[in-house]
């Protein structure tokens, strides 16, 4: 029962797959012992939460975590996969939820092929019964299950777009082809039952503004951001394809490509600025589940907004200075989120940081001057510091250590170049170049301000020699 309660504390605010009172009641009555699909989804939930506990995501001191370490997450995970073999053609909500939860658990465990397998199974079952349209949902389902299905559908929609951004996969679920309403914005699950909603605010989402008293209002805004992200991502990939192929579709649908990156960015910024304050600032975690759900939305909005900025930015040509500036802003945005939320949301949130490679990756394909590499170096050190603060999530120091190792290689190369090819004007003065080693505990750049921001007489090697083996999406497991 502890694993179920922890789920509603640290996973449910991002993936509200269940109507909490209903599922708690089912588990407390041990209904999973007599209904196999309920057993499958319950074991899948245990696999995900157990993995979060293993990775240090649960920071609430009220939980006695030691007994929960006794069963490894892999035991739950493998059992859930085994149970789902009995439901290869069944699209009940529990089977769909089980695949969805195992996909998230696979991300937690660094099993990206498994993630695609479970997302693929989910999308196959949805396609078989046309569940992208509410008109095809089972007849006679109550209000509660309808709300659960809406939450599940849009949760996996966002996960599909997220996985496409982070791992470069295809988009399997298009919002344009989906006919599923957003979840009702009720303050608490206790306010809904199969007779409907008891909320005094039955406002249609299409006509109401964002509400500061309802965490699901922030959750629905995140879905809005992912819908924008889908179109931005499609446009970005389309522009790359047009650059390499002479597609007849370009001329046929030219009007589809006239929206500018800046206009989209401005529109999204206005959407963000219109949010209630509770969704724009992430307060310290209180360990009051109902209050903290607002903090989870604020943290996830920050991360998703930055991911969208990265994709929009990558779609337009920009200077190295601009790219480093936006990358620093992304790191700073993550650093503004209290650590407890980053730990709780865990590995899926951290993969957003890999998007910085979308910005900086192309930089490394160009021959760079010293000033440009200094900018890249600054971003890398900021990234290393942020990852270092979160090492507990991935149980190793590989990510931040690899970045620092690459920075050291850059420093060594630059130091050698300074002795081989000194710039004619500035470096003759004694002490013009400061010590390149990093001071203890400091993350600031160690190059002097006197380095001119112009092209130097020498360039650093192109992609491969110094930074080619840096994995921007980071192996966090």
Question: Where on the chain are the PLM-derived regions?
Answer:
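Active-site-proximal loop/helix segment associated with metal-binding centers of metalloenzymes
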Residues: 225
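Fungal C-terminal regulatory tails
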Residues: 86, 90-91, 231-235, 241, ...
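Alpha-helix C-terminal capping/termination sites
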Residues: 108, 166, 306, 313-320, ...
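TPR repeat positional signature
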Residues: 41-42, 46, 94-95, 99, ...
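Residue-level recognition of tetratricopeptide repeat
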Residues: 104, 162, 309-311, 316, ...
């Amino acid at each position: 029962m502890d694993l179920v309660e922890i789920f509603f504390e640290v996973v449910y605010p991002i993936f509200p797959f269940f109507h909490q009172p209903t599922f708690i009641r089912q588990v407390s009555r041990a209904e999973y012992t007599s209904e196999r699909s309920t057993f499958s989804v319950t074991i899948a939930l245990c696999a995900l939460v157990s993995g979060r506990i293993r990775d240090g995501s649960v920071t609430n001191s009220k939980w006695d975590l030691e007994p929960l370490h006794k069963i490894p997450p892999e035991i739950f995970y493998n059992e859930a996969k085994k149970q789902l073999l009995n439901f290869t053609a069944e699209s009940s909500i529990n089977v769909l939820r089980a695949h969805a939860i195992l996909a998230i658990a696979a991300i937690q465990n660094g099993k990206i092929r498994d993630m695609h397998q479970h997302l693929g199974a989910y999308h196959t079952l949805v396609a078989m019964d046309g569940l992208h349209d509410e008109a095809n949902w089972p007849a006679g389902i109550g209000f509660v299950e309808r709300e659960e299905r809406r939450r599940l559908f849009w949760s996996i929609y966002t996960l599909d777009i997220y996985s496409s951004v982070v791992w470069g996969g295809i988009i399997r679920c298009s919002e344009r082809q989906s006919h599923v309403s957003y979840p009702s914005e009720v303050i608490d699950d206790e306010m809904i039952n199969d007779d409907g909603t008891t909320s005094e605010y039955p406002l249609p989402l299409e006509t109401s503004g964002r509400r500061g008293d309802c965490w699901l209002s922030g959750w629905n805004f995140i879905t809005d951001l992912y819908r924008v992200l889908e179109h931005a991502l499609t446009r970005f990939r389309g522009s790359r394809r047009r650059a390499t192929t002479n597609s007849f579709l370009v001329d046929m649908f030219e009007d589809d490509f006239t929206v500018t990156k800046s206009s989209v960015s401005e529109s999204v910024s206005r959407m963000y600025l219109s949010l209630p304050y509770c969704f724009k600032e992430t307060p310290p975690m209180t360990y009051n589940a109902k209050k903290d759900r607002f903090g989870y939305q604020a943290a996830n909005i920050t991360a998703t907004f930055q991911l969208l900025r990265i994709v929009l930015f990558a779609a337009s040509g920009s200077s190295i200075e601009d790219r480093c500036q936006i990358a620093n802003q992304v790191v700073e945005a993550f650093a503004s989120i209290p650590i407890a939320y980053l730990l709780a949301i865990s590995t899926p949130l951290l993969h957003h940081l890999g998007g910085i490679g979308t910005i900086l990756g192309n930089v490394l394909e160009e021959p760079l001057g010293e000033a440009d590499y200094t900018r890249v170096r600054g971003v890398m050190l900021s990234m290393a510091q942020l990852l270092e603060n979160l090492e507990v999530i991935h149980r190793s120091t590989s990510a931040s250590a690899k970045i620092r190792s690459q920075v050291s290689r850059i420093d060594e190369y630059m130091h050698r170049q300074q002795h081989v090819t000194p710039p004619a004007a500035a470096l003759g003065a004694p002490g013009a170049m400061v010590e390149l080693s990093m001071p203890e505990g400091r993350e600031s750049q160690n190059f002097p301000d006197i380095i001119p921001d112009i092209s130097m007489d020498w360039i650093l090697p192109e992609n491969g020699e110094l930074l080619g083996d840096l994995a921007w999406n980071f192996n966090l497991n």
